[in-house]
Amino acid sequence: MATNGEKVTATVVNGGGLSTGENPKKIVDLNTTELDRTDDILDGEVKGFSDSGEKKEETDSNGIGSTAGVDSGDISPVDDIQKKIRRAERFGVSVKLTEEEKRNSRAERFGTVAAAVVNGSEGTKKAEELKRKARADRFGVPSATSTTDKTEEEAKKKARLARFGKETKVDSAEENKRKARALRFSKEASADASSDLPEKQIIGKEAAVSGSAA
């Protein structure tokens, strides 16, 4: 035991405990009320947390969270979509993307930019016109614009009216023919009926005479 007036010192070798070896690594004054911060190396239990990895993992997780929070604002929507897809593939979960996300991913995959996103409705109209022209060139059909469409529609209407107008005239002529035929056959039927009446009257008279004679 050390008295109050004595100064006790001890040597420590590599933090392995107290020893009285010839080659002391550090001399520690045990009479001081508080050890220096650099002497924490001597305490194996305190540094054991870092050796075991608990504190290290905690700090790493905090660092990852902070970097993720910083980078989240700078991440493009395409990268975010790709991350979602990779995460879903890793966990075996189906990915539900919105229409905008699907368009962005498709544009990123094919290396093109969607015309609707860049130029709005005008871009979509131009894209549709280009598609129509390309299709017309491929099939050998002249591309039809809005003006040509209107002229073609008017020409079709005129042709239809002309065609149906002729048919109405033909129908009226046919109707007149039918009326004339009906009149002719009605006259013939009436003439036949009138010619048959005298014979019927004669037959009736003969029957009456024979009946009275009997």
UniProtKB/Swiss-Prot annotation:
Segments of this protein annotated with the region Disordered: 1-25, 39-78, 137-214
Biological processes per GO annotation: poly(A)+ mRNA export from nucleus
Modified residues (Phosphoserine): 76
Keyword RNA-binding: yes
Location(s), subcellular: Nucleus, Nucleoplasm
Biased composition (Basic and acidic residues): 39-59, 164-177
GO CC term, one of those recorded: nucleoplasm
Quaternary assembly: Interacts with RH15 and RH56.
First-listed, main subcellular location of the protein, grouped into a coarse class: nucleus
Alphabetized GO MF terms: RNA binding
Disruption phenotype: No visible phenotype under normal growth conditions.
Listed InterPro entries: MOS11, THO1_MOS11_C
Protein's UniProt name: Protein MODIFIER OF SNC1 11
Alphabetized UniProt keyword annotations: mRNA transport, Nucleus, Phosphoprotein, RNA-binding, Transport
Function of the molecule: Contributes to the transfer of mature mRNA from the nucleus to the cytosol. May function before mRNAs enter nuclear pore and in the same mRNA export pathway as MOS3.
One Pfam family matching this protein: Tho1_MOS11_C
